[in-house]
UniProtKB/Swiss-Prot annotation:
The lineage of its organism: Eukaryota, Amoebozoa, Evosea, Eumycetozoa, Dictyostelia. PROSITE patterns: RASGEF_CAT (PS50009), RASGEF_NTER (PS50212), RHOGAP (PS50238). The keyword Metal-binding does not apply. GO terms for biological process: Ras protein signal transduction; response to differentiation-inducing factor 1. Keywords: GTPase activation, Guanine-nucleotide releasing factor. The record marks S67 as: Arginine finger. GO terms for molecular function: GTPase activator activity; guanyl-nucleotide exchange factor activity. The gene is gefD. SMART domains: RasGEF (SM00147), RasGEFN (SM00229), RhoGAP (SM00324). CDD domains: RasGEF (cd00155), REM (cd06224). Residues 433-663 form the Ras-GEF domain. Residues 237-362 form the N-terminal Ras-GEF domain. This is Ras guanine nucleotide exchange factor D. Promotes the exchange of Ras-bound GDP by GTP.
Length: 668
């Protein structure tokens, strides 16, 4: 046809090559066809792919190279020769169509097609009409592929680009012979066949799948040249973000490709973004992508816009109290709201929430964190002076905004107005019993744990009381439980009473463990293990065998060796609701903070570090639950909340201890 060279086709699979050389003994090597790609892709495979590409480019002008499909059954001898390494090149091949069909067959026989994991996402991304955003999404998807898949894909994309150019050049050279249709068919056939071999397609999405391949081919030179702006790692079989630029990080919050299976990703960014950016910059990016969404086709515009607004509202709700005091953030938000004069009906809910930032603070808010149970405590709220000043600034920013000053808002934040209990009420903890006392201790500890916002565990905020008041409240209570334990024992002058008291507190620690309150249990064990108590040999000797065994088990549980291994193993295996030992979280968080940089060597945001931080926050939040069903006894609870009033000073413990059991008496 035309000036194209006519090639006589062999119907018997006519790649003969060195197979015709008789008397050659060879050992068949490991197959490359139908074998899953591995990280250590074999040199044989890469050699085969490279030689196939070189050969096909040399024969790109051959009529029917890709438009003629050779049946798989006729390729058997070709594949056997390749597998047996009898074919070292294709110089003796009598039909290039066999090389082309075998090349495509290799990809279609992979257990998992080269683009199978991102096929649906690629198809969806093609529908994005904003060119820059679309190509960024596609590149991000390609980076999520395993390295071996990505490298092989790049080889083929480069081949398709060169093949298309060769066909076009040949078409221009032979335009007088009307070969345009032939060349167009060859290029289209190549795209069609590689699309089928690479992606999971259906008749309904095949055309758009081909378009996805074409877009990747058009971008391949730029993709190869640019530095990688997002990195992934595999967890539980799914690709999750390991590191990224700020732009790619924000794009992934919206996940417009519908294939990003990383349930903790948004939480990670929302809780840790201030390690590498500001609320103003994050809001700026969200607004930027919202404006892009407004330029998309009608089909995508509503869906994408709502996704972006949902992400924005989710982030703002988590940090509502903090953002309410960030005037730069409020200015940025106000500018955005003013730029959307007519809010679509489907977006009213989101914009109504955004407007709440410009209403005066009547009472400190207790916004719910995303897990639904962790509240900001009163110490994080503004002073009345700061609040008044802020409200005045906000009102100046308001334009025709109706402010509903509702003075009837019910405020239940740590109110003690109904507390008529006398702090000096006479409570006999020994008659009440260790189990009931343990319950009331647990109620107190649980309330204190729930009051700690996640922000107090980040940026080492826990190291400064001014930055973590609720955290330090619970630490102080932990120390108070320990001091109370030691003080109560030392307050008993009679040996018999000391033995009873010592037994009681061992039983109290045991009861706390049984209730899941490991924090108080560890505090009590610390009080029992205070050197002023541990030296009371006469007292310890009088303990019953059972009580001594209980104490030994408690010591083993809270043994410091191997980073609290026994304790960690126990809480890992328990399915019960617990109050964990608070002191380990700072230790774990400091290890993450100091052991990982915020940015990688190539200046990407180290998402892996922040994921580790959030995993600890997530664990803490899982404990911040209204866990316990037993009833509160206000007299006992109030007594326990105020036990520090009558305790001995720790500096006096040793002198009291020596008075109770002098060294001479212990040695007699």
């Amino acid at each position: 046809m035309g000036n194209s060279k006519q090639i006589k086709r062999s119907l018997t699979g006519s790649i003969l090559l060195k197979k015709q050389i008789s008397q050659i003994f060879f050992k068949k090597l490991e197959s490359i066809f139908g074998i899953a790609l591995a990280e250590d892709t074999s040199d044989r495979l890469m050699d085969y792919l490279n030689k196939s590409i070189d050969y096909l480019l040399d024969h790109s002008v051959i009529e029917g190279l890709f438009s003629i499909e050779i049946e798989e059954s006729k390729l058997k001898s070709t594949i056997e020769s390749i597998e047996s390494t009898l074919i070292t090149d294709f110089s003796l091949t009598t039909d290039p169509c066999y090389v082309a069909s075998t090349f495509i067959l290799y990809f279609s026989k992979l257990p998992n097609l080269l683009l199978s994991k991102i096929s649906s996402q690629l198809i969806h991304s093609v529908e994005i009409s904003h060119e820059e955003y679309r190509i960024n999404v596609i590149r991000s998807l390609l980076y999520s592929l395993p390295l071996q898949n990505r490298n092989i894909l790049k080889m083929v994309l480069h081949f398709l680009k060169k093949f298309s150019l060769a066909c076009n050049n040949n078409n221009n050279n032979n335009s007088e012979n009307n070969n345009t249709i032939v060349e167009d068919i060859e290029v289209q056939s190549a795209y069609n066949r590689f699309t089928k071999a690479f992606m999971s397609t259906t008749p309904g999405n095949f055309e758009i799948s081909c378009k996805a391949i074409r877009l990747m081919v058009m971008d391949i030179d730029e993709f190869d040249k640019l530095p990688q702006d997002i990195q992934y790692m595999v967890k539980d079989g799914e690709s999750i973000v390991k590191a990224a630029t700020f732009d790619r990080l924000v794009e992934k919050l919206f996940d417009l490709s519908y294939g990003f299976k990383d349930p903790d990703y948004n939480y990670t960014v929302f809780h840790t973004y201030d390690y590498y950016t500001t609320s103003v910059e994050l809001l700026g990016k969200i607004v930027h992508y919202y404006r892009i969404a407004c330029t998309l086709t009608t089909k995508l515009q509503m869906e994408v816009s709502i996704t972006i607004l949902s992400v924005a509202m989710f982030w703002m709700k988590i940090h509502h109290n903090h953002l309410m005091t960030d005037l730069q953030f409020l200015q940025k938000l106000k500018i955005f709201l003013d730029s959307v004069p007519q809010v679509p009906p489907t977006q009213v809910t989101y914009f109504t929430y955004f407007q709440t930032f410009f209403k005066p603070v009547i009472e400190p808010l207790k916004p719910l964190y995303e897990r639904g149970n962790s509240f900001l405590g009163p110490n994080l709220t503004q002073s009345s002076g700061t609040s008044k000043k802020k409200n005045q600034l906000i009102e100046k920013m308001m334009i025709n905004n109706n402010i509903n000053n509702n003075n009837n808002i019910n405020n239940n934040v740590n109110s003690n107005s109904n507390n008529n209990f006398n702090n000096n009420i006479d409570i006999d903890i020994y008659n009440i019993g260790s189990n009931i006392i343990a319950q009331q201790i647990t109620i107190i500890d649980n309330e204190m744990l729930m009051a700690i916002p996640p922000s107090q565990f980040l940026h080492k905020s826990f190291s400064k009381e001014s930055k973590s008041p609720q955290f330090h409240d619970m630490v102080s209570k932990f120390n108070e439980w320990a001091r109370w334990t030691s003080s109560e024992i030392l307050s008993k002058e009679k040996l018999v009473e000391r033995v009873v008291t010592l037994s009681f507190f061992i039983d109290l620690a045991k009861s706390c463990v049984e209730l899941g309150n490991y924090n108080a249990a560890n505090a009590i064990v610390g009080g029992l293990n205070h050197s002023s108590i541990s030296r009371l040999k006469l007292t310890w000797e009088r303990l019953s065998t059972k009580v001594t065994q209980d104490y030994d088990r408690l010591l083993s549980l809270f043994d410091l060796s191997m980073n609290y291994k026994n304790y960690r193993d126990e809480i890992k295996s328990t399915k019960a609701k617990i109050i964990p030992y608070l002191g380990l979280f700072p230790k774990d968080l400091i290890a993450i903070e100091e052991g990982n940089d915020n940015f990688t060597n190539n200046n990407l945001i180290n998402t892996e570090k922040f994921r580790l931080l959030y995993q600890t926050i997530k664990k803490i939040q899982s404990y911040q639950q209204p866990l316990f069903t037993f009833k509160t006894s206000e007299p006992i609870k109030q007594y326990l909340k105020n036990i520090s009033n009558g305790l001995s000073e720790e500096k006096d413990f040793h002198s009291i201890s020596h008075k109770l059991e002098p060294r001479q008496q212990q040695t007699q």
